[in-house]
Amino acid sequence: MKRIGLLGGTFDPPHIGHLLLAQEAIHCADLDEVWFVPVGIPPHKEREEIASNDDRLAMIKRAIKGKETLFNICTIELEREGKSYTIDTVRTLTKKHPDVRFFFIIGGDMVKSLPTWKGIDELLATVTFIGFKRPGVLLDSPYQDQLMLVEGPEVNVSSTMIRERMTEGKPISYLLPLDVERYIYEKGLYKTNESRKSPSVSKTSSN
């Protein structure tokens, strides 16, 4: 049976933290693939607060370029109208792919919020949650015995941080793949400072 991890999020924008989580999940849970699942309208946000579906999808494609044998994109939530709930996505995917064992990848901060998730008991019975925790940090959750808890690399990077740095005119290089960074500047996302130039590969000269 194929083992596929689901990594949901707004990916606004996708960054190195997302890629590291996906890579570590493949290693720790012996996954065949990780599917990035960009949400349409997340339950806790409004539509105008996030970049368009087309822009976020384009950035994910650039982020996983060259790694398509391990990373893929599932657009099921972008195609669904209204707010996106994980339980609806899992129900659809398990029905469509009965020969796949699904894992759902979450960060340590989300482990604590699991009791508030819609249909959490059904989710726990249907998929295996992979919860990443920071080294030395104890997680307090009534469901922690039902999760696969692993210690992953600690990367203090978030999409919010990147957007804020953009609005402040600060560099975002090395926080996300170069192709994603270029796309952000080319499309003028996140109120980019027009005086800043899009990153480019510097040319080296021989002496």
From Swiss-Prot:
It catalyses: nicotinate beta-D-ribonucleotide + ATP + H(+) = deamido-NAD(+) + diphosphate. GO terms for molecular function: ATP binding; nicotinate-nucleotide adenylyltransferase activity. Pathway: Cofactor biosynthesis; NAD(+) biosynthesis; deamido-NAD(+) from nicotinate D-ribonucleotide: step 1/1. Its EC number is 2.7.7.18. Pfam families: CTP_transf_like (PF01467). It is an enzyme of class 2 (transferase). GO terms for biological process: NAD biosynthetic process. Catalyzes the reversible adenylation of nicotinate mononucleotide (NaMN) to nicotinic acid adenine dinucleotide (NaAD). This is Probable nicotinate-nucleotide adenylyltransferase. It comes from Halalkalibacterium halodurans (strain ATCC BAA-125 / DSM 18197 / FERM 7344 / JCM 9153 / C-125) (Bacillus halodurans). The gene is nadD.
